[in-house]
Amino acid sequence: MAEAPRAVVEGLTVAFADRRALDDVSLELPRGVVVGLIGPNGAGKTTLLRALLGTVRPSAGSVRVDGTTGFVPQIGPGGWDLPLSAADVALQGSYRRTGWLRRPPPGEHDRARAALAAVGMGEHARRQIGQLSGGQRQRIMLARALVQEADLLLLDEPVSGADAPTEAAFSNILARLRDEGRTVVVSSHDLAWASARCDLVCLLAGRVIAFGPPADALDAACLARAYGGQVVDVGGVLVLAPEGHHAH
């Protein structure tokens, strides 16, 4: 008997006052996979993540998640001068169980230390969060989601702007989480990363253009539909053309 999916999205439409962000989106997210959300700016990637998280109210349709959900937001350059250590930030993941006003018990501190070690940040546990690089902060936020013991992990552009070693290390962490049976959904603009690192790709442009293995979802025809024809073949590699470029 096949396992039930981790999450099911049926006929999801999300409309804001001035625009419709998602239109009749339906998909099933299996257990134990890394799913890439790919699409142009304004395609609805972040809106879909928020719908899965439960922080966006659908205008129509439904979202069902079997298990707990953790969210890793985009990491900006500012706002990191708070007097918090990496361990303090990771420990915030326990507040769902303990509440914000209670002192976390020792077991929660152990869980936070284990999560930091799992993302390769154990040796930085006592460092102030503002002293860490962007890639290191991203790992700390992932550790916070792990402390939540989330079954469905949602990440908003975690490898954007990362150097090659950081991207590889982060991707290896996601693969390990997948192998533990978690479902990992990653919003990204990086076609090469999604093709190499994701088990499934959901290509969005306000609606689902394609959903399946990267070789199918990221073929030239699907990409042209999602990006308005701004896709060119460079030495056998499909890339997004710069604005104003015309493919021959």
State the predicted function of each range.
Residues 206-216:
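Conserved switch/coupling elements of ABC/ABC-like ATPase nucleotide-binding domains
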Residues 153-157:
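Catalytic Walker B motif of ABC-type/P-loop ATPase nucleotide-binding domains
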Residues 219-248:
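ABC ATPase nucleotide-binding domains
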Residues 128-132:
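Conserved ABC ATPase signature
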Residues 188-189:
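H-loop/switch region of ABC-family ATPase nucleotide-binding domains
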